[in-house]
Structure formats: C-alpha cells, structure tokens
C-alpha cells in the first residue's frame, strides 16, 4: 500500500548534514533551491532542478498535472523523505499516475530520487520521460561555467543547445573559479540522450531523456537517479552516485581528484589506462578515505606516449574486496570508466556502457517483392514513397521479371527506385547504370536526357523526431550517380526520375535500363512509361511559398567548397524549384526599399526571368516597404501591369503573440489602404490563433484544423476565400509533415489533405536552414527534437542537391494538379451530360475517405495513394475525351 505521511501544501526545506533543498508542491516538485551547507549559494538556476515531464511540448494538447500532493514520509528513520504524487492529463500520458520520492541521507551531499510511473488508464501509452536541471554552480551563471557529459563521440565540454546520445550516465555543471559542481547520475540502462542548454552565458542546463517505453494498462516504469553537489573540482571527467572526478595529466603524472558525496573509509584504488590501440598501463594502487567536503588527490606515475584519447579504468576496494559504486543507479560494473584527452585527438569515440542509446534503432524489415533480377545480386523496384532502409531484406516472390512500368501525365516527372542487394556470401563491385531513349513506336520518344539516375545518401538520426519512432540512417540526399557496390548486408537504392515534357504525345514508351558490374553479364531492365493524354498546368494549381535565405545559402555553398557566384547559385535554386513546381520566396520576393524603386523592380524582373515570372505561384512584397508608401504604390502598379497581383502578398507578421495583435491589425489596415491588390497575411497557430474576419488571407498552422477554430477555417475555405496552411517542427505524428524520419506517405499526404479541405496554398519556412556548426550531411536534429525541419535542399560545391523529400513534395504538388483537373473535368461533364456513364465512376474516385479519413488516421500504405492517383489520372483522360466529342 502507498506510504502515508504529513501532507505539505506550502514551500518546504529539508536538509542533511551536508546539503539542503527547497521545493513547493505547486511547482511539481521542482527544486527551487539546492545548496551545500558549507556554501550559501543556490545551485538551482532560474528553471530549478529536477523538473520532470513526458514527450514534447504541444501548444495544442498541453500536459497537465492533476491531484498533486506532496507528503513528508517517516518510513525511513534517519532521513527525511519527500513524496510527490500526481495524475497526468495530455497526449500519451492520460491515465498515468506518478510517484516521486526524494531522500536525503544524513551523511551524504546528494539526493536520491525514485521516479515511478503507473498506467492506471485503459489504453497503452508511449511514454517518453525526461528530467531537466537548470544549474547555477557559482554565485551566477557566466561564460566560465562548464557543462560536461560523455557522448558517443567522447567528452563534451562546450555544448550548445543540442542533443547528445549518452555513452555514460552523468552530466555536470561546474564553476571553475569557485570550484563547485552540481551533477546528476542516471540509470545507464534507461538513459538515452542528454539535451544541453548552453546557448549563452546565462544558461547552464541539461535534460536527461530516458528510453521511451510502451506502458500497458496496469504496468509501471521506474527509475532511480541522483543529484549531487561537491566542491574542489574545476571540471568533471567522471561522476557516479558517490563522487565526481577530475583527471589531469602533467609532468609525467596522471592525477585523479575525487570529490565525494558519501563517506567511504579505507579505500584502495586499482587503476589502469587504456589507449586506442589497446595498450594497457597498470597504475600503482593508492589508499585514501573519502567523505563529503574533502578533496582527495591520487597521483600516478604515467606519461602519455602521444596525443590522443585514453580511457581511465579503476576499481575501488575496501578491506580487500570490491567497493561497488553506483548501487542505486545501476552501473554495469560498479567501477570507474571514463575518457580523457591529451593534446589533440582525432578519434574520441566512446562505446556506451549499455545498449540504451541504440534502444530505438531501426530493425531490418522483410520486404515481399517480385525481383527484377535474382542472381548473385537481387534487384527490385521500390515505390518512391517507400524509404528503403539499409537493413531492409527482400523476400523474393514468384519468378523474377526484369520489367518496370510507370505512368505520368504530360509535363510531369515520375520517380521510382531500383534497389540492389547481393545475396549472402556475394559482393558485387563497380555497378554502373545507364538509361536509353524510351520510344513509342511511332517516331516519338522520351530522350535519355529526361531520365535522371541518382544515388541516395543516408543521414543519421540519433534522436527520433518528437521522441516517437526509430533512430538510424534515413535516405534523403540525392547525388549524381557513380558506380557503387552491392553488399550482402546492405540494401542500396538508386533514384530514377522520368520526365515527360509537356509536348510529349500520349502513348506507351518503351526502352531499357542497362546494368553492368564486375564479374557479371550485362543486365537489361525493360522500362515502360505510359504518358497519359492530359497536361499538367504550367503554373501549378497549388500556390506555394517556401522560404530561402539566399545570403545564408551562399555562405553554406562557400563552406562546402562551392565557387559559384550568388547569381549563379540563385539560378540553380530556380532550376530545381521550377522542376519541382515550388515557389521559393528568396527568388521571388520584390526588392527592399531603394532610392530608385522603379529601377530596382526592373532589375528584379530581369533577374527572375520570364519563365519564373510566368510559373511562380506567389510573389512576396517586403514588409519594410510599409514605411515608404510611394514604393508600395509603385510595387502595386507593377504587379497590376504584369498581371501578377493575384499572386502577390505581404507577410506582415509571423505567429504574433496576443499582446501584439492590436498593432498587427493596424498594419493590416495600412496595407489594405496602400495596396488593395497585395494581400497582407499573418501566420498563426495554437489554441488562440489570430484570425481577423476582414483579413484577405488566412495562413494557419496545420494543427489548428483539429481545434475548435477548425470549423471557422473550413467555412472560410468552403466559401472560396484564400486559406493557406503551414507545417514546421510541429505537428508530430500521427499528422503529416516534411520531416526526415517520417514515411514517404506522411511527407506526401499533406497535399491530398490540402485539396480535400479546400486550402489553396502551402507555406514552409525554409528549404536550406542549417544551424551554426552543424553538418547537414551528418545531422539534421534540432532541440525540439525533430529531424530535417527547414532543410529540403542540400548544399553542394556545384550548386544544390535535391532531397528525397523534395522529390516527394513535387509529387504532392502534381497530385494537387491531378485533383484540380479531375474536379474541373467532372464538373464540366456533369453540366454537359448529367447522365454520362463516366460520372458514377468519377463519384467513386472522388471519394477520398479511405485515403484521408481525417488529418491523422490516414493509411501509410504507398500502394493505396499511388493507385488512387492512377485512377484519377485515367478518369481525367476519359472525361476530357468525352468533353471533346
């Protein structure tokens, strides 16, 4: 039965002989104070210590604590025990009951925390627990403070605001001047990663993320962790329940400084040093006592043979027997195991103590596929919506047939994948692929130049988006194809894109893809492309506004070794944008204020060029023009003259908070007065979005549709008014988004939802945002956490590299064209011939309920989406033919 005690309803402070802590039940048990009694300074930063939570914050479904109760228990005779209990309400946590116990042993300078989560609800929950500590190790947080931990890449001493998969189970903040440290130690079987907040001199916080668990009704999850405080160290190189340690190498000595949180007399340390080449140095044993407030120095004779990373391994013995460390937090061996670096090290990778950092890793999937080739090497076709993982294994079905068929409209690009994997025991090298012309037998052809072959590079994801899903390598970067190997333990995709120019005659086109490899006879894959007898709109029906910071893109281009001028790079972006039917704001935004604004507009028109002027679906007018009414009028007149006013807008504000709404309304009114033909708009989201009735355009976050405001948005869309929406780091699954580790269907279904809801525009904040210091080819994670938000195009020394997601987005824009042409033909046929035999079939095809029943419950099966697209495409052909008779 649950322990009973004295209920606390106000701030409470408890202390041992070495530390004190203060908390309040209304603050969810967060420690507002934590101090060494020998020092008056509070180690808790502004955000407090031991803030606990689950998952990722949502502005739509906030997590709440219910029935909060704090008690002082007297079940342990020699120490105070605080127990906090509460019930949870929110996404993935409803029905959870939380119990947290904090114990202060009298002769220790740390607090032991036992955190237990019980599912008292009726549904299983995906529980992603975390603990956050905002630390102020000295009198004030400043630039000298050190936040340290051990990642898979070794010691981290200068973190930013980012995640680190944990190779060891501790994190520490130290003031090297005052030599005070506050550190936390977690169960290494539970700790997945550490998120650090050291983006400026005023914050030093870390957040421990535990391995998420599926918690069934009636089941519990529990962990134990410790928060300790010590003095005497200028940094921390290792920490455990009982102590923190600093390692120094100088003058032929390796010195271990140990600051303890407990009292352990008559200890003997048996230590060794391990080099990367597995050379081992056994160090002479040292004897000492440890107790809180006392700094122990153990000096060993050892000089490094060279610069590099070394491991320090040690066992403590007491009375000749091992003195096991970290009994509470569950160290795998009860000893000391850490890394230190001498000079410059090229290899600092550190194997984790446990498999926890890899607990969410992708698992091989068995793919039932008909093989194109089934010999030493297996080759098969994959949908462009199936993100092929390197560990995926084909299970051949039936007899191999070297035939691939696709269908596409005139003016459309259609992709598919050729997947390669050697049979067990085989290795195939120097695989080369070429494509020939596709001919229709009547003198018409799709030339080989319209068939693009690209390799697919993978980007590693160590933290899943929103802590939901799996980790591992995800296919995304598309590069010009070079020869490649096929191995028995890895599947390799090749991305094939066929484009039918708008003037391509309808019909069936046939040709071959040739595959050559060392030690194998040449292979031919027969490719059939059916060109449907209708043409996509030259200017897409779906309006898009995707952000691009050309200055940042140019700097990134230079960083990867590019030599293009800014104008040449802009042309590369324009080419891929037009090929993918997307409008990039960085290319189509009108000039900023200028003394000769007419001249600036003329230069802008020349830079953009006639193709983009004709095909772009949006043109942004800079908000800063509002201070220059004459320039606004000139821009407005220019838009009218070029017949582009229906595509013009001005972004007045981005997701303004409620206190700013009055000012934003004034700005909207000013724009409508100055330039009635330029639509002012404001992006908005959350449970209280900014939705003024007289605003020309609404730009809402996608998840607003699932709130009470969704009814008003849908009403406005049904009236044919201008409604756009956007995604960014939100929404999470099960919604659609453009994130790296979302499935292809989850990337593409957004366009079908856009059509079904009557929304006519999609906005996206950036296509090539890279955080400072980040290598986009290795890591696309932000602190949300999400992977790939704001990056759809990769930098290249030759210009721009498309992503697999960029291709899927193009297909989604084309889907919207299909649906637009389908609806137009159906409406015209209904008016011309209400009893036409095609109309019942068209009505069935128009029913998208199975494909998109709502914003979250759509099937993830690529076949269902692709079959619906083909069904609609064929009906467009038939209905247009019927209308032409």
PLM features: residue spans?
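Acidic-aromatic substrate-binding/catalytic surfaces of carbohydrate-active enzymes
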Residues: 9-89, 203-204, 337, 444-445
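Beta-strand-rich recognition/accessory modules
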Residues: 5-19, 26, 41-44, 87-92, ...
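Surface-exposed binding patches on compact interaction domains or structured appendages
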Residues: 69-74, 277, 349-400, 413, ...
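Extended, loop-rich substrate-binding clefts of extracytoplasmic carbohydrate-active enzymes
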Residues: 54-112, 136-138, 197-207, 213, ...
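Catalytic-core regions of glycoside hydrolase
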Residues: 542-774
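Acidic, contiguous internal or C-terminal segments within carbohydrate-active enzymes
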Residues: 86-140, 497-523
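Catalytic domains of carbohydrate-active enzymes that cleave complex glycans
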Residues: 222-224, 231, 622-624, 630, ...
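Polysaccharide-binding surfaces and accessory modules of carbohydrate-active proteins
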Residues: 3-5, 9-14, 19, 42-51, ...
